[in-house]
Amino acid sequence: MDMQTGSRFFTDRLADSDPDLFQAIRSELTRQQDQIELIASENIVSQAVLEAQGSVLTNKYAEGYAGRRYYGGCEYVDIAETLAIERAKALFGCAYANVQPHSGAQANQAVFMALLQPGDTFMGMDLAAGGHLTHGAPANQSGKWFKVVSYGVRRDDHLIDYEEVEAKAREHRPKLIIAGGSAYPRQIDFARFRRIADEIGAYLMVDMAHYAGLVAAGVYPSPLPHAHVVTTTTHKTLRGPRGGMILSNDPELGKKFNSAVFPGLQGGPLMHVIAAKAVAFGEALRPEFKAYAQAVVDNARVLADRLVAGGLDIVSGGTDSHIVLVDLRPKRLTGKAAEATLEHAGMTCNKNGVPFDPEKPLVTSGVRLGSPAATTRGFGTAEFAQVGDLIVEVLDGLARSNGDNTATETRVREQVRALCHRFPIYPAL
């Protein structure tokens, strides 16, 4: 590397160094600015979180934990990780936090590694009922390495069948029971899960990845008083960078989780991501975050009400969280078709199975909607009522159109863009 090239290495901007990638990122920024994000697992982070994640901490290796690293030069990344840990403990009122997992899936894997042996039995919610891949789906490592007993929801109201959980726990005596899911919109009775676990001597693990921000703000029940261990992502309703975390009130179990994360599953932690987690946790400790989380729930309920008024079914009859799971069968539409037409109209969501869904997993009878991202950009109940009406307009157009919904999509897309421009994001980027 000559001197001129070396000096440019530290000064060239992305637009000059890699224009193709720069343009892709600019296009993604425009997409986020001009579309309404309704994917329940997505959110929009603050400028401060972006800055921390794009900082020089990306250069630093820091295997181990604060004060016990396998590398030198960790004085300042130790500060970042300690801030993240202490803020997480304050946020959730717990005694232990590990902020190193790269994802929620790896946080779950770490708990399995700490508490189970290959071939052990655990219980989790069936993916088809609203669970998660890592809760024992056959295609996932959790379903390959362990014996999985799945529980579901009742046919009549689509709520967790606690009697089934209890009966299966007594029959199969799992070593671990998982509560939580990725498409379950209602409150979960964590105390009842703990009673079931205690009766058979099992650990209770709660995966609150979807609900963490709501839990932190006190608008959704906390699992921490009941669970032996809680895992979560740090994005979704918590509004931080994409990553994972493990929480507990048992420091002795915490030692096992630490060893499972490192050296069990991971090597060097991503210190720039951990710094961004610290920023997000600090933001969530502020009073305005509670108002945000309450708005997330209020907005989701308004959205659900407007969709019902428009002739759609809502799984479980409503929501206690940010998730609105929509059954499209009243309009004779599939989730695959609905996802595509809504995206063409400027609203992104994901196709999702509904309980006892007759369609294939890549087709589905439903879509999953969420309120966190649009609430972050400033949408209130009036805007979510409008969004609900726009969704119905697009879906009704598709139901009438024999597959060509272009006219409705174009008309609604202009309304979506106008609505988004009233609530701009990242004006300085």
Swiss-Prot record:
Pfam families found in the cross-reference section? SHMT (PF00464)
Keyword match Transmembrane helix: no
Q: Write out the residues that bind (6S)-5,6,7,8-tetrahydrofolate.
A: 127, 131-133, 252
Checking CDD domains in the record gives:
SHMT
* Residues making up the signal peptide according to the UniProt record: none
In chain numbering, the residues marked as site (Plays an important role in substrate specificity) are: 235
Q: Which UniProt keywords apply?
A: Amino-acid biosynthesis, Cytoplasm, One-carbon metabolism, Pyridoxal phosphate, Transferase
Which residues are reported to carry the modification N6-(pyridoxal phosphate)lysine?
236
Q: Which GO terms describe its biological process?
A: glycine biosynthetic process from serine; tetrahydrofolate interconversion
* Catalytic activities: (6R)-5,10-methylene-5,6,7,8-tetrahydrofolate + glycine + H2O = (6S)-5,6,7,8-tetrahydrofolate + L-serine
InterPro entries given in the database record:
PyrdxlP-dep_Trfase, PyrdxlP-dep_Trfase_major, PyrdxlP-dep_Trfase_small, Ser_HO-MeTrfase, Ser_HO-MeTrfase-like, Ser_HO-MeTrfase_PLP_BS, SHMT-like_dom
Task: Name the needed cofactors.
Answer: pyridoxal 5'-phosphate
Locations listed in the record: Cytoplasm
A cellular component term (GO) from this record? cytosol
Q: Name one GO molecular function term.
A: glycine hydroxymethyltransferase activity
From the UniProt record, give the pathway where this protein acts.
One-carbon metabolism; tetrahydrofolate interconversion; Amino-acid biosynthesis; glycine biosynthesis; glycine from L-serine: step 1/1
Give its E.C. classification number: 2.1.2.1
Outline the subunit composition: Homodimer.
In the record, the note on similarity to other proteins reads:
Belongs to the SHMT family.
What is known about what this protein does? Catalyzes the reversible interconversion of serine and glycine with tetrahydrofolate (THF) serving as the one-carbon carrier. This reaction serves as the major source of one-carbon groups required for the biosynthesis of purines, thymidylate, methionine, and other important biomolecules. Also exhibits THF-independent aldolase activity toward beta-hydroxyamino acids, producing glycine and aldehydes, via a retro-aldol mechanism.
Question: What is the designated name of this protein?
Answer: Serine hydroxymethyltransferase
Organism, by scientific name, is Rhodospirillum centenum (strain ATCC 51521 / SW)
